[in-house]
């Protein structure tokens, strides 16, 4: 049986939380801020939790995290 490996692209983008969820950075944060309000920019700053419907898929990509 081949070695299990983490998907490196996913490992760079997602962090596992203590309760088994996943956090990731927000999209729409690299440029074109003139079209966004101050509130939108502030809310995009931190990390956000991934949707529960996708957690099963991420667990397969990152078996060791």
Swiss-Prot record:
According to the UniProt record, where is the region Disordered?
A: 1-52
Family annotation (InterPro entries): Ribosomal_bL35 (IPR001706), Ribosomal_bL35-like (IPR021137), Ribosomal_bL35_CS (IPR018265), Ribosomal_bL35_sf (IPR037229)
Domain of life assignment: Bacteria
Instruction: Kindly state one GO CC term assigned in the UniProt record.
Output: cytosolic large ribosomal subunit
Supply one GO BP term: translation
Q: Where is the composition biased (Basic residues)?
A: 31-44
Write down the SUPFAM superfamilies for this protein, in alphabetical order. L35p-like (SSF143034)
UniProt GO MF annotations: structural constituent of ribosome
Q: Write out the entry's keywords from A to Z.
A: Ribonucleoprotein, Ribosomal protein
Q: What residue ranges carry the coiled-coil annotation?
A: none
Question: Record's family?
Answer: Belongs to the bacterial ribosomal protein bL35 family.
Q: Which PANTHER family match?
A: 54S RIBOSOMAL PROTEIN BL35M (PTHR33343), LARGE RIBOSOMAL SUBUNIT PROTEIN BL35M (PTHR33343:SF1)
Name of the protein: Large ribosomal subunit protein bL35
Print the organism lineage: Bacteria, Bacillati, Bacillota, Bacilli, Lactobacillales
């Amino acid at each position: 049986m081949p070695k299990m490996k983490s998907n490196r692209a996913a490992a760079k983008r997602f962090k596992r939380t203590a309760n088994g969820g996943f956090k990731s950075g927000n999209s729409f944060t690299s440029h074109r801020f003139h079209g966004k309000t101050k509130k939108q920019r502030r809310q995009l700053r931190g990390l956000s939790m991934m949707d529960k419907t996708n957690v099963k898929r991420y667990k397969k990509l990152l078996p060791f995290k």
